[in-house]
């Protein structure tokens, strides 16, 4: 009985490129141009801001506490710094420059996915070619991958290196392959790069090591060469980190000491050991997480020698013993697991073998279609509500040669108590300037105090800083900011960053206030 007949959309090849990879490329292109902001703050504070400082646009002493603690590897920031430098050569707008970084990220993920599907046999024995093709389709069209393909976070960066690793092991360490020392050395190097892309990927290397020893029965000589390759790559990145931090540093050791020994990570929240098992079935973010959990659970019994089985459970249990848990921590492995889903579909088909397979697996076609639909929606949807507004105001400033002054809240960092803006400094430009609440308070004291009057606060700050356009995120729902009290301000938008209720008041400029109000509401 045939498990899966590829629908017309995915049937055949266009040249040597499979249509589902073309779909992934399309989602990546859309994400580059339409997906503004980031999925998680770490994407900026630990990567883009670091890269921005590396190319000389930002200040090292204004980076997040991770820089002072010297716990962040510089591999991905330098990966982002090169296209970022090119982007700022083309335009001084950060909203243009970041597109170059997203484009490189999307291209890298596409190359890694293509290599994995071409070289890795997914290490799931018993799947026929059609089922393997289905696994590739499910991977390339998954909502999680579509959502992150044009991101710059470490989760998708690590997932791309994992796919390269799985493709390499599939090509060189299959059951019919003879092991060679050079293959083990380069495998170790690849693991070293993956480890410095995200330190939690050490669980993957541990799983691979035990798999090579127990299942593949690699010799101690070959395993030692593998470790040598890992150490060689690690040494290169230790030197890079030491150069960027201005002194010898082993960032993995610092990371472990800060987050595990000192418990800094736990200050962001702790969860019981079983939290991930609960989230598999309840979290809306983990699209397909329950299916991955069910499939990999079955694989423990029916495919215990599968490398993916070892990697998945090492990764899950390794993260389960750490007190601080976030669903995104599992993304690097969950992104890859759809290639295993056809195994579950095959088991179901055997249970209902008396039913025509075309009728049994019509839900598979629906799953692919729905994944594509949601993937496209995700690619078009801006990630950060406030960044769409910032980009728009930046364009206003450039068109009218005016400055936009931003006043936003700050948040405490858990380790040192330093305060950094919620919106990264990366998005500041000659047309987007910053004023902090403490500056406003100081100005109030010098003028005899007007802290109880939000309208006078806005008026005074705008007048003293002399911006032609002023943007405020003051914590107030007071709509009394009218033309009578703010007649020296060209543009005021109140409480836009922290609220979905937008109050826009337009003075002097040719911007249509009603249109801006509707636009801002639509973006938020």
Question: Could you describe each region identified by the protein language model?
Answer:
Residues 4, 9, 167-191, 202-234:
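Perimembrane helix-loop-helix junctions
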Residues 18-25, 230-231, 235, 301, ...:
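Signature aromatic-anchored transmembrane alpha helix within multi-pass, membrane-resident enzymes
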Residues 27-33, 44-71, 75-90, 169, ...:
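Extracytosolic helix-loop segments that constitute the early lumenal/periplasmic catalytic or substrate-binding loops
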Residues 28-33, 135-149, 163, 169, ...:
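Membrane-interface alpha helices of multi-pass inner-membrane proteins
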Residues 242, 357-517:
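Catalytic lumenal/periplasmic loop and adjoining terminal transmembrane helix
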